[in-house]
Amino acid sequence: MKKSWRNNVEFYLIGLLLLMVIAFSIAMPNIFWSVSNFQSIASQMPVLGILALAMAMTMLCGGINLSIIATANACSLVMAWVATSYPPGGATALATLLAGGGAAMIIGLCNGILIAGIRVSPILATLGMMTLLKGINILITGGSAIANYPQWVLWLNHAQWFGIPLPMWLFAVVAAGLWVLLEKSPLGRAIMLIGSNERATHYSGFNTRRVLMWVYVISALLCAVAAFLMMSKLNSAKASYGESYLLVSILAAVLGGVNPDGGSGRIVGMVLALFLLQIIESGFNILGISPYLTMALWGVLLLCFIQARGMLGLERAG
């Protein structure tokens, strides 16, 4: 059935986005509309955006992945070790990316086995994985950072195409790929059905355990992509980087229309939510407002949006 504007999540997000743009345009027209400000937003959004997509993948099937930050840090440490241990070159670059992807697949498979195979609660399984990975990351590095990467790692963060940072293009490609996966593929349909009712989906002939395994592997691989972007941006890798992204990624997913109980959500809504959060953060930074107040505003925004979902029936908007 066609959705009306009243239960269309994207409609409200566009309204909030326009409201924020108008407010910041009035408060600081010259700075807010500067090219450097929008390039700054475009450079900051990809890491958070890809991590939020990694979180959303698991929430769509009724789960959650609390280990996304620990997974990203583990992958970045593995890639950092390979990139700094061997001479720069095509073989080293390929080995670095394969090592990060391999580490992500192992972590994703472990989460998938715990959740789909052993039937551990997603929140407990990924919380345990997060704690395990953080401990291993700190143990291996001693809490210190691995830095001073070769130029080919740093190139990604500085490269632009049509004036837009290359990481933003990479985020767009990842988001478009996930949209195709969720909207046009049998796997995407199965993910949504599992989120709505896993038992009924199983009895309908779907291999729900295999689907859940794929979900957590894809989530981990997205973390590896975010990890490489963090490496390129920060020129270092550390066990404790990006910890504030965990709650913000959940916020972006829910604000973007992903049902925390699973079964509904759209990539378009998530992208709009990410733009909204980044514009708020950028505007507050320019105004010199404390980042803690920004975080508090995000919390208020989430609570208000949850209330709106209940009042306007947005929870039924898939």
Please give the residue ranges for each predicted region.
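Single transmembrane alpha-helix segments in multi-pass membrane proteins
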Residues: 22-28, 33-87, 113-119, 254-267, ...
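Cytosolic-side transmembrane-helix boundaries in multi-pass membrane proteins
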Residues: 1-23, 176, 196, 202-210, ...
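Alpha-helical transmembrane segments within multi-pass membrane transporters and channels
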Residues: 87-129, 173, 272-273
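Inter-helical junctions in multi-pass inner-membrane proteins, predominant
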Residues: 30-40, 137-140, 182-183, 188, ...
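Hydrophobic core segments of alpha-helical transmembrane domains in multi-pass membrane transport
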Residues: 13-25, 55, 101-104, 130-135, ...
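Transmembrane alpha-helical segments in multi-pass inner-membrane proteins
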Residues: 223, 233-299
